[in-house]
């Protein structure tokens, strides 16, 4: 299992009970789907929209907050895999718009961010299919509904 360093920066997250357990379970579920994963420590920032918007502008050149940002640590980071930053307001609004629990949406985005730290991407359709299949399986381990219910689940990386 990968270790998690949880940082709660925005007080808006205080209403979510069991944050530490939720984060650790999401990372654990993702790890179970990645037997060849790179082990290490993941820092997870539960932030606000303003802070994530600032990071989005600084590191991606994009205006506004986004739900999740992943920052791989690179080759010379010793045991640190990277950082995942999550914006409470964006995630809360998305959860409400999709009529899903905030905790379930957060689990999904943590898994999504962790997969980026493991080298997965979704820029191309085939990459997205693989990544989404892993997300689906990891979320199913947690009893979380498919976040892509109207899409073909694709073959996934472990299909024969």
From Swiss-Prot:
Gene3D superfamilies noted in UniProt: Metalloproteases ('zincins'), catalytic domain
EC number, UniProt record: 3.1.-.-
Cofactor(s) needed: Zn(2+)
PROSITE patterns named among the record's database cross-references: UPF0054
Pfam family, one: YbeY
GO biological process: rRNA processing
SUPFAM superfamilies named among the record's database cross-references: Metalloproteases ('zincins'), catalytic domain
InterPro entries: MetalPrtase_cat_dom_sf_prd, YbeY, YbeY_CS
Keywords: Cytoplasm, Endonuclease, Hydrolase, Metal-binding, Nuclease, Ribosome biogenesis, rRNA processing, Zinc
Cofactor, how bound (note): Binds 1 zinc ion.
Residues binding Zn(2+): 112, 116, 122
CC per GO annotation: cytoplasm
Enzyme class name: hydrolase
Molecular-function GO term, any one: zinc ion binding
Function: Single strand-specific metallo-endoribonuclease involved in late-stage 70S ribosome quality control and in maturation of the 3' terminus of the 16S rRNA.
Family label: Belongs to the endoribonuclease YbeY family.
Annotated protein name in UniProt: Endoribonuclease YbeY
Origin species: Maricaulis maris (strain MCS10)
């Amino acid at each position: 299992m990968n270790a998690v360093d949880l940082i709660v920066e925005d007080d808006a997250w205080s209403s979510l009970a069991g944050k530490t357990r939720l984060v650790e379970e999401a990372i654990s579920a993702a790890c179970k789907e990645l037997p060849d994963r790179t082990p290490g420590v993941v820092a997870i920032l539960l932030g606000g929209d303003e802070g994530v918007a600032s990071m989005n502008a600084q590191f991606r050149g994009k205006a506004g907050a986004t739900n999740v940002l992943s920052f791989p640590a690179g080759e010379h980071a010793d045991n640190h895999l990277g950082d995942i930053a999550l914006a409470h307001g964006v995630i809360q609004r998305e959860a409400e718009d999709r009529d899903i629990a905030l905790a379930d949406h957060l689990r999904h985005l943590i898994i999504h961010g962790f997969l980026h730290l493991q080298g997965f991407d979704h820029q191309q359709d085939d990459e997205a299919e693989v990544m989404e299949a892993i997300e689906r399986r990891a979320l199913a381990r947690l009893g979380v509904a498919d976040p892509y219910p109207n899409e073909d689940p694709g073959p996934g990386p472990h299909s024969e």
